[in-house]
Amino acid sequence: MNENMNVMLKEVDVLKEQLSALRPLPEEALKKIQDALDIEYTYESNRIEGNTLTLQETALVVNEGVTISGKSMREHLEAINHTEAISYIKDIAKQDIEISERTIKEIHALILHGIDRENAGRYRTVPVMILGSTHMPPQPYLIEKQMEDFILRFKQMEKEKVHPVLIAAYLHDELVRIHPF
């Protein structure tokens, strides 16, 4: 790891300590912050996949159950399902449940609930391309093994006490590279 990376990770640790020193935050303030972040995360995640709901519309769909005129049922379900998946991930973290291929598939199934029953929670069975990228994800027959290796490497990184930011970067990069769904 290069020196710049070490400096940045130390800065992250200092900022985390500063944030921790402010705790406990009032419960109501913490909930408002978390709710706002969840909506923004849902909006951005769905937007990059082609969902046309605005940030405000996403908040209305998720928080108020409002149906937005001119938007498809799929777009509404994508917002609702993504929020449910975030909630599930938080539950996994609180209960200290081990991340596995099964939990990853369960998260995927939540995201596609009511949208694509056939593929929800299942690795893809067809080759894919990522628009605007030169990267070609692995062929479907390679996914199972690559996901097994992905989980094994993740567990090894945890065991080695690798910095959480580096673990998160690895997880994100590998899921994008493998593109299992």
Model-found features: residue ranges?
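FIC/Doc superfamily catalytic core
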Residues: 1-181
